[in-house]
Amino acid sequence: MSQSLIVALDFPGKQDVEQFLRHFEGEELFVKVGMELFYKEGPAIITYLKEKGHKIFLDLKLHDIPNTVKSAMRSLASLDVDMVNVHAAGGSSMMKAAIEGLEEGKQEGKERPICIAVTQLTSTSEAMMKKEIGIEKTLEEAVAHYAKLTKESGLDGVVCSTLEVPKLREVCGSEFVTVTPGIRLASDDVNDQVRVATPKRARELGSSYIVVGRSITKAENPLEAYKTVKQQWEGVTV
């Protein structure tokens, strides 16, 4: 299950990434490249990470008109990344266009990247959703609605909180992919995320993938922190 543990490379540039990855010589990681790093370094950072043997979740959360998203996904698929995402709030036509773009852009002989949709950010509380975003449903209802729409649009799964995974299993089935950020070791600060969980709790709730950032990247010993998270995620007793 180690390949379903995704390490968030939330760094401002390649130099920081190189320094961090020195702790993981010989390890093939599944890493997340977000907006900050990709916008600074461009496709070259993807090439660098692929050459190191790492799998890549390119976390750009596309949200635009269908034709623009289709064209963007065609370009992203050509980078040979393993996972990409969009905002479910973009609607069914946009999500279907994303899949079309990925199919057109995928490298010959390769499967298209896994495509998932963001339901609600883990920094979103129910009060914020109702007051600022204008959604009157409960948070769980809103996430379930977006997840169902995502599945009907042909995507592979969603980004969601661990707390929502059991409900989404009911709504979308056991094969529907759930990628859960907001993962912290019990001793860590939650920082700016509201809906968080430990690796053990994520496993118990049925997450397909977990995304772990600061618990590993800010640790005094990132490799040891990675091993601790991995052990908890895989249910290994040491």
UniProtKB/Swiss-Prot annotation:
Pathway field: Pyrimidine metabolism; UMP biosynthesis via de novo pathway; UMP from orotate: step 2/2
Binding site for substrate: 10, 32, 59-68, 122, 184, 193, 213-214
InterPro entries assigned: Aldolase_TIM, OMPdecase, OMPdecase_AS, OMPdecase_bac, OMPdeCOase_dom, RibuloseP-bd_barrel
GO BP terms: 'de novo' pyrimidine nucleobase biosynthetic process; 'de novo' UMP biosynthetic process
Molecular functions per Gene Ontology: orotidine-5'-phosphate decarboxylase activity
PROSITE patterns, A to Z: OMPDECASE (PS00156)
Reaction(s) this enzyme catalyzes, per UniProt: orotidine 5'-phosphate + H(+) = UMP + CO2
Leader sequence residues: none
Residues at the active site: K61
EC number: 4.1.1.23
The entry's keywords: Decarboxylase, Lyase, Pyrimidine biosynthesis
Description of how the protein assembles with itself and partners: Homodimer.
Record-linked NCBIfam families: PRK00230.1, pyrF
PANTHER family assigned to the protein according to its UniProt record, in alphabetical order: OROTIDINE 5'-PHOSPHATE DECARBOXYLASE (PTHR32119:SF2)
Family per similarity comment: Belongs to the OMP decarboxylase family. Type 1 subfamily.
Stated role: Catalyzes the decarboxylation of orotidine 5'-monophosphate (OMP) to uridine 5'-monophosphate (UMP).
Stated name of the protein: Orotidine 5'-phosphate decarboxylase
Record organism: Bacillus cereus (strain ZK / E33L)
Gene: pyrF
